[in-house]
């Protein structure tokens, strides 16, 4: 079983990448993720049985998205403590099964999208968004789709703005080795670099009409 170097039941993204057999996997904003391309829906669906077998053996509860183009396997974040230690053994088992089925890993397709709702310090808008979207609370400040199909929401206060105004931007979590290319593509498409002081953890971009997007890679590299 994969274990963290600290001997706990949890590990960081950096620790998970050091495990054997997990080269196909990247850690996004919703946890470890791998994408395997397929030739058809039936080809992609053949990975389900090995995933279920690994789930029953290791106790990892994945989210699996099967499409004609391929299959996405995610190990969703269920705790702020980090990635479950058993996740690396699960990931290696899934990757081995995918290779045997001639499914092709493509880490460049891994990503997750989050919505960052910046609220005035005197406001609490999380209940409104939870009610409107049918979401449930996740931790003290976030909200999630109960089936983890929609983007995760994060709520954090801002100061200096009038209470009547809210500001929201998208967080795009991508593999660390894909982040710069994604930033460059967005800038080429007319975007503006608003702030790169936190790079390579994340870059803040603005669209031509000033909508905000953060391209974030820190989830794929963080360590304790």
PLM feature spans:
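Vicinal oxygen chelate
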Residues: 2, 66-67, 73-85, 89-92, 112-120, 162-183, 202-206, ...
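Charge-rich, low-complexity N-terminal segments
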Residues: 2-22, 29-32, 37-77, 85-114
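Short, conserved charged micro-motifs
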Residues: 41-47, 82-85, 123-125, 177-182
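Positively charged, low-complexity terminal tracts
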Residues: 49, 130, 137-138
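N-terminal beta-strand motif that seeds the catalytic metal site of vicinal oxygen chelate
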Residues: 99-124, 168-169, 219-224
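Conserved active-site tyrosine of GNAT-family acetyltransferases
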Residues: 125, 129-130, 186, 210
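Iron-associated oxidoreductase/ferritin-like identity signal
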Residues: 125, 133, 149-156, 162, ...
């Amino acid at each position: 079983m994969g274990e963290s170097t600290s001997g706990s039941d949890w590990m960081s993204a950096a620790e998970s990448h050091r495990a054997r057999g997990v080269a196909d996997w990247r850690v996004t904003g919703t946890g470890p993720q791998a994408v395997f391309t397929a030739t058809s829906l039936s080809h992609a669906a053949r990975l389900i049985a090995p995933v279920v077998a690994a789930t029953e053996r290791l106790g990892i509860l994945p989210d699996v998205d099967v499409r004609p183009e391929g299959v996405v396997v995610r190990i969703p974040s269920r705790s702020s403590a980090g990635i479950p230690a058993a996740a690396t053994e699960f990931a290696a088992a899934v990757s081995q099964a995918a290779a045997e089925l001639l499914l092709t890993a493509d880490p460049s397709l891994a990503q997750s999208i989050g919505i960052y709702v910046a609220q005035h310090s005197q406001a609490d808008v999380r209940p409104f968004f939870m009610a409107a979207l049918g979401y449930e609370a996740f931790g003290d400040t976030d909200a999630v789709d109960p089936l983890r199909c929609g983007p995760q929401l994060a709520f954090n206060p801002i100061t200096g703005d009038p209470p009547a105004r809210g500001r929201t931007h998208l967080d795009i979590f991508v593999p660390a080795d894909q982040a710069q290319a994604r930033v460059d593509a967005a800038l080429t498409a007319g975007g503006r670099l608003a702030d790169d002081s936190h790079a390579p953890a994340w870059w803040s971009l603005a669209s031509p009409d000033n909508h905000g997007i953060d391209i974030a890679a820190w989830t794929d590299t963080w360590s304790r």
